[in-house]
């Protein structure tokens, strides 16, 4: 009988561990600039040029502008990386921003940097704001203004009335400035809020959305930003109507705060 020699033992080889591939930032962080436009044909080209120089795509929302302004927007939208959305009639700054946020998401962007078309925002801070947004993708990256001598004193002092109401309506000092529109929105949670609640469509929008995002515990990061009011700048603030809308907005938020007061106070005690 033939005897079979046993096979030599097989030396076990260590199994190499494979680290999971980390997602490339470019795969999930896709920011754009969102610019609501209403008859800003003089200042808009320079704003778009500065943002495109930073390699940031731009979504222009024409909020019922004049034919002259619409022509400028059409010409800018011929550039690569510049998109436009047009409202047949003016809906107000808030309405333009809301439409722009939805359009940005439809185009595949993850975040939107809101920029005013009148040139008052210091765009040298774009890179810093986007860097912070990539580090904290769920946070709203909010600018709080550093004014120069060009700021109208009446407008500056009037802001403090809104600051006080925001602090009351959040039971917190966390929101440093709710009126500066230079901020980066994470689109997913922002649009989820806009799908649930109808917010103000005009000058009341910037403040109301921050208060409601605070209520839902959305993280916020605050960065200083320089603000300059051009001597020939275009303002569409309507003294009586917009102040009435802002007052009504504060009243709505106050009622909402009363309903949420136990939760808001409990949140403060936990910190």
Predicted regions, residues:
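Acidic helix N-cap motif at the loop->helix transition within catalytic regions
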Residues: 42-46, 67-76, 124
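Short beta-strand-to-loop acidic/aromatic patch adjacent to the donor-nucleotide binding site
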Residues: 109-120
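Acceptor/aglycone-binding surface of glycosyltransferases and processive sugar-polymer synthases
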Residues: 89, 94-106, 123-203, 230-237, ...
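A conserved acidic beta->alpha catalytic loop
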Residues: 62-71, 119
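Short, well-formed alpha-helical segments that are part of the catalytic scaffolds
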Residues: 17-22, 38-53
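Short beta-strand/loop segment that forms part of the nucleotide-sugar
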Residues: 56-65, 85-87, 115
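Cell-envelope/extracellular polymer assembly enzymes that use nucleotide-activated donors
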Residues: 30-32, 57, 208
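Hydrophobic helical membrane-anchoring modules
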Residues: 2-28, 196-271
């Amino acid at each position: 009988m033939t005897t079979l020699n046993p096979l030599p033992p097989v030396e076990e080889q260590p199994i190499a561990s494979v680290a999971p591939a980390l997602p490339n930032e470019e795969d999930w962080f896709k920011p754009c600039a969102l610019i609501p436009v209403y008859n800003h044909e003089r200042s808009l080209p320079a704003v778009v040029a500065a943002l495109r120089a930073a390699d940031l795509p731009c979504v222009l929302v024409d909020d019922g502008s004049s034919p002259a302004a619409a022509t400028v927007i059409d010409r800018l939208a011929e550039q690569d990386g510049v998109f436009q959305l047009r409202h047949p009639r003016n809906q107000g700054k808030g309405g333009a921003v809301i439409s722009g946020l939805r359009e940005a998401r439809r185009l595949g962007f993850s975040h939107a940097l809101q920029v005013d078309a009148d040139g008052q925002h210091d765009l040298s801070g774009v890179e810093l704001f986007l860097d912070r947004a990539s580090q904290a993708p769920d946070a709203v990256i909010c600018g709080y203004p550093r004014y120069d001598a060009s700021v109208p004193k009446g407008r500056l002092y009037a802001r403090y009335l809104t600051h006080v109401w925001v602090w009351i309506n959040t039971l917190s000092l966390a929101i440093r400035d709710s009126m500066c529109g230079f901020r980066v929105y994470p689109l997913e949670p922002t649009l989820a809020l806009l799908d649930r609640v109808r917010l103000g469509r005009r000058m009341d929008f910037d403040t109301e959305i921050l208060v409601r995002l605070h209520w839902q515990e959305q993280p916020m990061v605050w960065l200083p930003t320089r603000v300059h009011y051009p001597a020939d700048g275009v303002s569409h603030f309507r003294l009586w109507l917009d102040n009435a809308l802002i007052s009504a907005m504060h009243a709505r938020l106050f009622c909402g705060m009363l309903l949420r007061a136990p939760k808001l106070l409990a949140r403060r005690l936990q910190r």
